């Protein structure tokens, strides 16, 4: 994770699971009914405990559940939905790659790591470009999860703009235009890899709204 961090002891149960995960909101019924998804939800809740999104101020857990929900409602398989729940757990949360593989297996772990940024790249634009290429090379399943993630990200940014107005850029540490450029490049990569992506229409509609906001500021 980027920036200064402090290691604090966390309360765990006899299995080494973070007890704070039990304080998270109950998962949606469709997640709770699947042992695999329920386990992934608990891991995500632990990894993102107390985290909030810079864009809209919502609990970070809401974002990963939104990504998983988009995938589930579009009819994608349980493996993809599971990776959707955990896609930020290593990059932005406290879950290690080793524990992820141990708890969820190689397939889900590989998908999550394909969606994880290289935080050794300091430049925002270069880091995002490297991520897009990494996802592209990882194949259609990773690209699909990435598309759902971008749709949730843009939704969150638009909610943040509605809530915080021009303060949103200070909260994010970058400009709305910079984020829109990344999202546009992401959509181009998604459509080059998967010309008929189920998420393309919604992504284009949300990008148009961001463009209107950016244009109105200049």
Regions found by a protein language model. Name each.
Residues 2-218:
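Active-site helical microenvironments for divalent-metal-assisted chemistry
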């Amino acid at each position: 994770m980027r920036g200064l961090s402090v290691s604090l002891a966390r309360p765990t149960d006899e299995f080494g699971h973070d007890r704070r995960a039990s304080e998270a909101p109950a998962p949606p019924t469709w997640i709770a009914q699947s042992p695999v998804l329920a386990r992934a939800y608990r891991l995500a809740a632990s990894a993102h405990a107390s985290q909030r999104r810079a864009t809209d101020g919502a609990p970070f857990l809401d974002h990963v559940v939104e990504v998983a929900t988009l995938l589930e409602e579009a009819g994608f398989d349980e493996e993809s939905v599971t990776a959707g729940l955990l896609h930020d757990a290593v990059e932005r949360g406290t879950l290690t790659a080793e524990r992820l593989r141990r708890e969820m297996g190689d397939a889900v772990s590989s998908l999550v790591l394909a969606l994880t940024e290289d935080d050794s790249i300091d430049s925002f634009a270069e880091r995002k470009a490297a991520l897009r290429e990494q996802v592209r090379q990882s194949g259609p399943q990773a690209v699909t999860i990435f598309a759902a993630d971008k749709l949730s990200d843009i939704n969150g940014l638009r909610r943040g703009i509605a809530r915080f107005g021009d303060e949103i850029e200070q909260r994010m540490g970058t400009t709305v235009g910079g984020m829109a450029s990344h999202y546009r490049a992401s959509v181009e990569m998604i459509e080059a890899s998967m010309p008929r992506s189920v998420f393309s229409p919604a992504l284009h509609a949300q990008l148009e709204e961001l463009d209107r906001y950016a244009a109105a500021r200049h």
